[in-house]
A protein has these predicted regions:
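Short glycine-aspartate micro-motif
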Residues: 8-12, 66-68, 144-148, 262
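N-terminal phosphate-binding loop and adjacent alpha-helix
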Residues: 29-65, 74-77, 81, 184-188
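Short acidic-glycine loop/turn motifs at beta-strand connectors
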Residues: 24-28, 103, 157-162
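Short beta-strand-loop/turn "lid" adjacent to the catalytic site in phosphate-handling enzymes
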Residues: 60-122, 160
C-alpha cells in the first residue's frame, strides 16, 4: 500500500503522558491530542484501547493513517520492546531500525539509543532521540551539546552526526519524589500558583554550595523552619535546587563546547532552564521541544513509508 499522499500520525508516548499529532503529507498539523495516558497509567497494558481512543480524538482523517510512535511505548514495559541503537542519531538509522507491530497494521515504533555518559557509564534514552533527530534534520546541525529537560533530563554530545556522549539526570523525578513523598512534603503548599522566580533563584544559589545535594535538600527544610526561606516558595526553591545541581555538574562539559548549548524545551520548562543556565554563565540557543518531536516523527515516517 502506498502512503505517499497519506496523512501521518506521530505519537510521543511516554511514562506519564502521550502527545499525538495528525499530520498532512507535508508535515503540517491537522489535529493534536494530549492526555495522561502514559504507559505507567495503563494498568492492564491495553495499549490498543488507548490508541483507539487517541485515533477517535484525532478525527475521521486519522482512520487508516500510518502511525509512528516513539518513547517508552517501545520499552520492555510498553507495547513492544524496540531495543536500542548504538550511538546513531540520524533519521535514516532510526527509520531503518523501527519495528512494526504484529497486532496493529501500519504501526511502527522507533527504537531508543544507547551510549556512554560523560563519566564513561552506560546510558540510554527513548523518545528524546526522535526530537534530537528532528532538530538535526530540520536545522542541519551535525555537532553540539543538546539539553533535553524532562522527568529524566538528557545531555547529549553530537559529533559528525553521531552521539558521542549521553548523560541522564533524574531531575524531574527527584523533584516529584521529594515534593510528594519526603520530609519536605508537609512544608510545601498543596498548590503553588506557578513558579516563583525568587524562590527558584534561591534554589540555584543553594545548588552552587560546597556540601552537595544531599545536604542541600535538608537545608531547604531547615531554611523554611527557621524563616530563612518563605514556605510559599518552597516548591520553587526545590525546583531550583534540583535543576541547579544538574547544571552545576554538567557545566564543565557545556563550557568546553565550541558552540552555544542547544536547549530543547518549551513553556515553563524552557524558562526555568534558561534562567538556570544564565545563572551558571552558560549560553544557550532555545529550540522548541514540541516542534522537534513532531518533526522527528514526520521525517522518520517519510523514510519508512
Amino acid at each position: 500500500m502506498s502512503y505517499e499522499d497519506s496523512p501521518i500520525i506521530g505519537i510521543d508516548w511516554g511514562t506519564s503522558s502521550l502527545r499525538a499529532w495528525l499530520l498532512d503529507s507535508k508535515g503540517s498539523v491537522n489535529n493534536f491530542y494530549t492526555g495522561a495516558h502514559g504507559i505507567s497509567q495503563i494498568a492492564d497494558k491495553d495499549f490498543a484501547a488507548v490508541l483507539a481512543l487517541v485515533l477517535g480524538e484525532l478525527g475521521p482523517k486519522a482512520r487508516n493513517a500510518p502511525i509512528i510512535m516513539c518513547g517508552m511505548i517501545g520499552s520492555a514495559q510498553g507495547w513492544r520492546d524496540a531495543g536500542y541503537l548504538q550511538k546513531s542519531a540520524g533519521i535514516a538509522e532510526l527509520a531503518a531500525a523501527a519495528i512494526p507491530l504484529q497486532d496493529a497494521p501500519s504501526v511502527w515504533i522507533v527504537p531508543g539509543v544507547q551510549s556512554v555518559s560523560a563519566d564513561g557509564l552506560a546510558d540510554v534514552m527513548r523518545g528524546e532521540e526522535t526530537a534530537l533527530a528532528g532538530v538535526m534534520a530540520s536545522q542541519k546541525i551535525t555537532e553540539g551539546l543538546f539539553c533535553l529537560p524532562g522527568t529524566h533530563s538528557k545531555w547529549v554530545v553530537i559529533e559528525d552526526s553521531q552521539i558521542t556522549s549521553l548523560s541522564t539526570f533524574m531531575t524531574g523525578e527527584l523533584f516529584q519524589l521529594m515534593r510528594q513523598h519526603s520530609i519536605l512534603s508537609p512544608l510545601m503548599p498543596e498548590l503553588e500558583q506557578g513558579a516563583s522566580d525568587e524562590g527558584f533563584i534561591q534554589g540555584l544559589e543553594l545548588a552552587a554550595g560546597k556540601l552537595g545535594l544531599l545536604h542541600q535538600l535538608f537545608a531547604v527544610r531547615a531554611g523554611i523552619l527557621t524563616g530563612q526561606f518563605n514556605p510559599v516558595s518552597a516548591a520553587s526553591i526545590l525546583s531550583g535546587l534540583a535543576i541547579g545541581s544538574e547544571i552545576k555538574h554538567i557545566s564543565g562539559l557545556a563550557q568546553a563546547q565550541p558552540t552555544p548549548l542547544f536547549l530543547n524545551a518549551a513553556g515553563v520548562m524552557a524558562h526555568l532552564y534558561q534562567t538556570a543556565l544564565a545563572h551558571f554563565n552558560i549560553e544557550c540557543q532555545l529550540i522548541d521541544g514540541e516542534e522537534a518531536s513532531r518533526a522527528g516523527l514526520y521525517e522518520i515516517a517519510r523514510q519508512i513509508l
